[in-house]
Amino acid sequence: MVKDILARELRVVFCGINPGLSSAGTGFPFAHPANRFWKVIHLAGFTGRQLKPEEAQHLLDFRCGVTKFVDRPTVQANEVKLQEMRSGGHKLIEKIEHYQPAALAILGKQAFEQGFSQRGAQWGKQTMTIGDTQIWVLPNPSGLNRIRTEKLVEAYRELDESLVVDGL
């Protein structure tokens, strides 16, 4: 089981779809060697050093957290059913209302659209909020996503810089 890493007063909570088998096997988020999450958040400015999956709890040292829509592990995220995403979206709203991070970063357009019953999502900051929490849609860092690492870093850096401008 991959546990959430959450606390109050975080700058950002990154929300994945569900754990892959590598994460489920280790208990750490974004554990597959091809997943670029840890590299990207470091290069984008969220962490002072590149953490390893087994150091995930140290995200809190940088006022970052992680969660997911669905707890059930799968080989690929496309194995998650729409109803699981919708149910996960309701639970995610409750978590965000409780912890109130400055921003929630949903990793993937389809995840945002399915989890929150939205259509036509664009990358970046959304008009939808959860209380005072901004919602951002960022590309998923999975190794299965063909987007170049540089483009991932650019998208994530936009969020980091926006939070800095907001004094966070």
Swiss-Prot record:
One Gene Ontology biological process: base-excision repair, AP site formation
What CDD domains does the record point to? Answer: UDG-F2_TDG_MUG
Question: Recorded E.C. number(s)?
Answer: 3.2.2.28
**Which key words are in the record?**
Cytoplasm, DNA damage, DNA excision, DNA repair, DNA-binding, Hydrolase
Entry GO CC: cytoplasm
Quote the subcellular location field of this record. Answer: Cytoplasm
Picking any one GO molecular function of the record gives: DNA binding
Q: Does the keyword Disulfide bond apply?
A: no
The superkingdom of the source organism is Bacteria
Q: Which Pfam families match?
A: UDG (PF03167)
Broadest EC class assigned to this enzyme: hydrolase
Could you describe the subunit structure of this protein?
A: Binds DNA as a monomer.
NCBIfam families for the chain: PRK10201.1
The record's family statement is: Belongs to the uracil-DNA glycosylase (UDG) superfamily. TDG/mug family.
Q: What is this protein identified as? A: G/U mismatch-specific DNA glycosylase
Q: Which organism is it from?
A: Citrobacter koseri (strain ATCC BAA-895 / CDC 4225-83 / SGSC4696)
Q: Which gene encodes it?
A: mug
